[in-house]
Amino acid sequence: MAYPIFKFLFYPFNWAMIKRIRSTENIPDKTTFILVSNHERRVDSLYLLYPILKKLDKKLHIITMPTWWFLGDAICRQWAACIPLFNKEQAYNESKELIKSGKIVGIFPEGRLGKKEKKLKTGAVRLAIETNTPILPIGLKSSYVPFNSTLNIGKLIYPKKGKNVEKQTMGIMKEVYRLRDNI
């Protein structure tokens, strides 16, 4: 069972915070995938984890800034399934190994919260191409107000080798924003 404490503590929290989750049938149950979403609030990872955990009972390994690493590796990496972004190469390689072993990895191509990058991060597309893994786009309207957050889950996207990685990343994020705006 993935996240036994999460199910006990955070299922009620997410139930109270998320108004609607659309298109959960698009979450593949027999395929490893890379989850890509927009990033609006600190709780976004919890909101994204909720439908994955309910449908698949699997951990979602999300690339995060190393803010909480004073709690220790056991809590952050093993229990919470975070991938610390100490440096780009380390996070990329760790994500790649997790994907190759059948795990689900979550990435926010916009960069860190509160710092909207003009240039999107291309790691999700590069990982998808290198590991031959599809991307699951999720549009998220995130809120701290109860019954106000919504998720819209898109269909799998298969990035193409040999095509411009930046353009593919932009196309995936346009789909994420379309999903977010059409909830």
Q: Across the structure, where does each feature detected by a protein language model lie?
A:
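Short, Lys/Arg-enriched, disordered terminal segments
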Residues: 1-11, 24-25, 101, 178-183
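Short acidic-hydrophobic, aromatic-tinged amphipathic segments that line or gate anion-handling sites
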Residues: 21-23, 82-87, 159
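Catalytic core of membrane glycerolipid acyltransferases/transacylases, capturing the structured
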Residues: 29-87
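Structural motif corresponding to alpha-helix initiation and N-cap regions
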Residues: 21, 70, 89-92
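A generic structural signal for well-ordered alpha-helical segments
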Residues: 14, 55, 77, 98, ...
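Short hydrophobic helices that act as membrane-entry/anchoring signals
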Residues: 2-18, 73, 77-82
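Non-catalytic C-terminal accessory region of glycerolipid acyltransferases
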Residues: 31, 90-183
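Helix-to-loop junction immediately C-terminal to a conserved catalytic motif
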Residues: 8-39
